[in-house]
């Protein structure tokens, strides 16, 4: 895997202009985020597929009408155990294409991902992050996740729907927003590191069979849960940008987000990017490997 060069200054300027034009209405606005009302309007549409990132076991207790279910682990290399070389990295193009095809997740459909947001680990964002890397463009997450849709009156069902398999081709994986262990070790001082785990994890607790406790040297601590309001929806753009800047981040920085296995940190990376911190990366192997 190689980390590609960052975007040009023209794109960065463009991003900043977009952020400045965001409505100040108490909601988050971003190209990969839709609200529950929009998502409800897409239920039953032939060109839209809902994907429940909590997996089939959770979908048994209720999911959105027509949704298929999957888990991030099935989209990642799982050879060996957590912390082993390549464990948790994005599948190679052919293997990922086969997995997505088996779920009917094709590039000609609008893909809307569902998760548990603040109460989960960002499973929906990890899938979206991988779809972007695989060349998908019409992909979105629901702000507030499944709960927001249920509260807004979405039609639900017990059990996930049976997928309609289709042919999927992925030419390559785009590593623009992927950080590797090798690159981070080689050029550590070039990056600002953001640890998105809980206070206990940051301060040394070993909760998920990590090889050691603590955090990466000099890591800034911005909890994954700090992204959300009490109802599980994202905080407004302006509030998030202020939080990032007060933590010591600048839109000119190269920023690496990490957690335990690159799940919660994928949400952080996507939100950073949508807020104009374009030069941001998700370290998919994260603390398990480090």
Range-by-range predicted roles:
Residues 23-25, 90-183, 264-281, 285-286:
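Thiolate-centered catalytic microenvironments shared by cysteine-dependent enzyme domains
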Residues 55-58, 73-77, 117-121, 146-149, ...:
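Solvent-exposed loop/turn segments at secondary-structure junctions
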Residues 193-216, 220-233:
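A mid-sequence, solvent-exposed acidic-amphipathic segment
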């Amino acid at each position: 895997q190689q980390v590609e060069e960052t975007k040009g200054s023209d794109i960065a300027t463009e991003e900043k202009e977009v952020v400045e034009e965001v409505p100040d209405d108490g909601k988050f606005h971003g190209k990969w985020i839709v609200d529950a009302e929009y998502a409800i309007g897409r239920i039953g549409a032939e060109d839209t597929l809902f994907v429940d990132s909590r997996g089939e076991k959770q979908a048994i207790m209720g999911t959105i009408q027509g949704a298929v279910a999957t888990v991030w682990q099935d989209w990642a290399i799982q050879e060996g155990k957590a912390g082993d070389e390549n464990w948790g990295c994005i599948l190679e193009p052919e293997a990922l294409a086969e997995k997505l095809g088996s779920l009917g997740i094709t590039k000609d459909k609008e893909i809307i991902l569902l998760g548990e947001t603040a109460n989960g680990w960002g499973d929906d964002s990890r899938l979206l992050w991988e779809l972007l890397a695989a060349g998908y463009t019409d992909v979105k997450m629901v702000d507030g996740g499944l709960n927001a849709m249920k509260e807004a009156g979405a039609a639900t069902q017990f059990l996930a729907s049976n997928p309609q398999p289709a042919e999927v081709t992925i030419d390559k994986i785009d590593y623009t927003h992927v950080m590797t262990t090798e690159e981070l070790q080689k050029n550590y001082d070039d990056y600002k590191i953001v640890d998105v785990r809980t206070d206990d994890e940051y301060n040394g607790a070993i909760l998920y069979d990590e090889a050691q406790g603590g955090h990466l040297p000099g890591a800034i601590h911005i909890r994954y849960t700090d992204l959300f309001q009490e109802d599980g929806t994202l905080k407004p753009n302006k509030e998030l940008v202020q939080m990032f800047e007060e933590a010591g981040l600048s839109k000119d920085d190269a920023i690496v987000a990490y957690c335990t296995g690159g799940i919660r940190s994928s949400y952080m990376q996507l939100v950073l990017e949508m807020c104009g911190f374009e030069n941001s990366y998700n370290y998919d192997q994260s603390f398990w490997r480090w």
